[in-house]
Amino acid sequence: MKLFTHYIFNKKNTVLASMLLIGCSTVPRLGVWNDFKDELALKTQYLVEKDADKNQALQDTINFLLAEELTVDAAIQIAVLNNPGLQAVFEELGIAQADWLQAGLLTNPKLKAQVLSGGGEVKTELGIEQDFMGFLLRPLRVKLGEAQYQAVKHRVEHEVFSLIADVRESYYTLQGDKQLLTLLQSVVEASEAAKELAQRQYNAGNISVLDLSRHQANYHEVKLALIQNEIQVEIEQDVLNRKMGFTSAQSWKIKGTLPQFSEDEPVLLELVSRATENRMDLQALKVEIKVLEE
């Protein structure tokens, strides 16, 4: 059952009724996306933007990064701008914002008018009928909508940080395997030279067939390892390519050697504590639990 408030106006305050009608029919939009992307840029140190595929300036930036020797930061920046999965997640933020704004809207009041005549006089009355229960629940709906938006916001942040971590892991894995590939190529060359030398020594009668077989087996073993590593590098290149948002092969190249380990790496327990405090998915769950408690 709905409760309604009924306001009666005479000719003198008809203007007031019109103002009330206008005020109830519109809700100002909130520019939350710009605030969100600026906040996320500070946290991640990467440019965050949606619909980058429709922004020529951002596409030029991506092409410029691809033309240079690809660093881990460049790969992450491309992924944040170009990954279609992340772009879809950004749309969830827009939906949550729309739900939040919708929660603040009141049903449009009903305008009633009547003309009374009697005793030679004509009397005009204007009335506005408003859903009173909806009016009372509006603050609660707005608060709930904001809390749900904050939960979605934390989940979106979690997706951004997860993508950054995934791209960084893929980049360093590829970089390490490419470095191993270079090493295996040198080993294969050395093993092939040793095999050819052993063949000449065997032909001259200086070594046994068993020694020759050992050299041949060693060559084929390292050759197989090289082929397997080449396949693995191609797979990892494709994985990183897709994480950066590309569906077809791109002619990018990464740096060849892994960075040196820092001597000032934080201890594991400190990393675990920091991760627990800052994980965005946990922050989203905390917001949802708080809403349920209230």
Residue ranges and their predicted role:
Residues 57-68, 109-137, 141-144, 254-268:
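Small/polar, glycine/serine/threonine/aspartate-rich low-complexity segments that form flexible
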Residues 2-81, 230-274:
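Terminal intrinsically disordered/low-complexity segments used for targeting and assembly
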Residues 154, 158-274:
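Periplasmic alpha-helical coiled-coil/stalk elements that build and connect Gram-negative outer-membrane
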Residues 76, 112, 125-127, 171, ...:
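Membrane-embedded beta-strand positions in outer-membrane beta-barrel channels/transporters
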Residues 288-291:
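Long hydrophobic segments that form regular secondary structure
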Residues 81-88, 94-109, 126-144, 153-161, ...:
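A glycine-/polar-enriched beta->alpha junction
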Residues 96, 108-118, 169, 176:
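Short, glycine/charge-rich beta-strand/loop segments that flank catalytic centers
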